[in-house]
């Protein structure tokens, strides 16, 4: 899998070996490469402010090429068939590879202690490719055979609703709830396989939700979902306690997912009342 993103993702250009645990055989290699923009100024070349010309052409930005390479070999006879199947199962193929790329980005965020480094989604990519070739070929952006995928489709409702909500937030017609932000962080952690972090985030999100959403209990839809959400408080608290001890059992991860879905439903019900 290979993507091209505008700007920098965080990790420095290089090759990063991914293992399940120390001393395990390499499973994947994440390659971060930079395609320097032709008009990009050198870092530190101009340290003083300058007058901005009206209507000036924006500077081009760097492009980061990120590649996830599986170390499992593919036979020559089965390579083309593998590619066709990978394209057909786009969601799974892209999702698994993107999780590895985001693991590298998340690792950089921790290593650099930089809270502003964020994961990426497929929708953010300027280009998405699936292909096969030798390790050196793929790392250098070349292939024996590849497919460039069209951008993922977004429903019109998904495009309009955030814009309307944003306008309401900025105009003071709506408020941002702490439980919303905590729920989003829990969703990101859960989707990226960070069950411990998701359980801890969700435990706080539920406490905030029970306090913040109480003001909308007059809405039957919100009240019903709040009551159902209370049923998940104990399982989430148990999962959060397990997270502090080291890890979650599969059933606890499922409990976190179920509770998070309930919280997301309650938040949607509140928005429907606006």
PLM regions and their residue ranges:
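Charged, non-catalytic interaction/linker regions at domain boundaries
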Residues: 1-177
């Amino acid at each position: 899998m290979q993507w091209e993103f505008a700007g920098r993702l965080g990790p420095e250009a290089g090759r990063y070996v991914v293992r399940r645990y120390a001393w395990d055989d390499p499973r994947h290699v994440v390659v971060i490469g930079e395609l320097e923009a032709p008009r990009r100024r050198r870092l530190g070349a101009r340290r003083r402010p300058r007058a901005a010309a009206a209507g000036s052409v924006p500077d081009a930005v760097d492009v980061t090429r990120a590649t996830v390479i599986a170390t499992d070999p593919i036979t020559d006879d089965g390579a083309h068939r593998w590619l066709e199947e990978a394209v057909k199962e786009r969601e799974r193929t892209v999702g698994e590879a993107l999780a590895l790329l985001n693991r590298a980005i998340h690792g950089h965020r921790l290593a650099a202690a930089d809270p502003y480094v964020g994961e990426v989604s497929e929708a953010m990519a300027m280009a998405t490719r699936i292909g096969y070739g030798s390790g050196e070929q793929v790392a250098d952006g070349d292939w024996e055979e590849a497919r460039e995928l069209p951008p993922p489709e977004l429903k019109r409702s998904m495009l309009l609703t955030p814009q309307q909500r944003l306008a309401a937030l900025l105009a003071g017609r709506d408020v941002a709830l702490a439980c919303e932000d905590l729920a989003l962080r829990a969703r990101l952690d859960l989707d990226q396989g960070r069950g411990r972090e998701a359980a801890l985030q969700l435990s706080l999100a539920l406490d905030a939700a029970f306090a913040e959403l109480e003001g909308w209990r007059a809405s039957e839809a919100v009240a019903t979902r709040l009551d159902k959400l209370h049923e998940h408080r104990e399982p989430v608290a148990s999962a959060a306690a397990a997270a502090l001890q080291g890890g979650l059992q599969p059933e606890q991860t499922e409990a976190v997912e179920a509770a998070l879905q309930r919280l997301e439903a309650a938040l949607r019900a509140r928005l429907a009342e606006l």
